């Protein structure tokens, strides 16, 4: 995101450098380029700001979803008091799975907010809804789809089957996690595309219409 902001600043700088004061009378928020095109800087800047903020929020959702991969690494483990590593504690994964469920609740809350944001395209909003659907499906499976997950002594195999994408047993919960990851990736790509589209308006503005010469 920092690199994208730097690119935006550089683009704005180049636009200002290429502008002059000739041509038709401009509004306070407009600048004219030497080829006769005009930029409404207030409008374009607002679009870029909103698109960037939306993309940043989607990135937060992606980070939460991807963090399940890190939680999965703690299956069957406990903190080792005399070391920086872990000790084995087999088949005690209830709290870990509860933490994963809480994470998905947080994802759901963020998605509710994203869906309500005005100004995003129907395509992007549709992708938000897809992510919400997959997240809800995962929550349902974690919460009540399999009684083996909702207990303190949830086994290592059941926990891996639920949240470890490298597990090859192909459980239903794990399949839902894969679908959620795929949907989030698509949403992030679309959100970043909105930012790029907003930036392109700086380099492809609308031509100023010349006044009619007819008397």
Swiss-Prot record:
Topology term for the membrane: Lipid-anchor
Pfam families: Lipoprotein_6
Family annotation (InterPro entries): Lipoprotein_OspC, OspC-like_sf
Leader peptide range in chain numbering: 1-18
Aminoacyl-tRNA synthetase among keywords: no
Lipid-modified residues, S-diacylglycerol cysteine kind: 19
GO cellular component, one term: cell outer membrane
Covalent lipid sites (N-palmitoyl cysteine): 19
Miscellaneous comment text of the record: Genes for both Vlp and Vsp families are on (usually) unnamed linear plasmids in B.hermsii HS1.
Family, per entry: Belongs to the variable small protein (Vsp) family.
Its job: The Vlp and Vsp proteins are antigenically distinct proteins, only one vlp or vsp gene is transcriptionally active at any one time. Switching between these genes is a mechanism of host immune response evasion.
Protein name in UniProt: Variable small protein 6
Source species of the chain: Borrelia hermsii
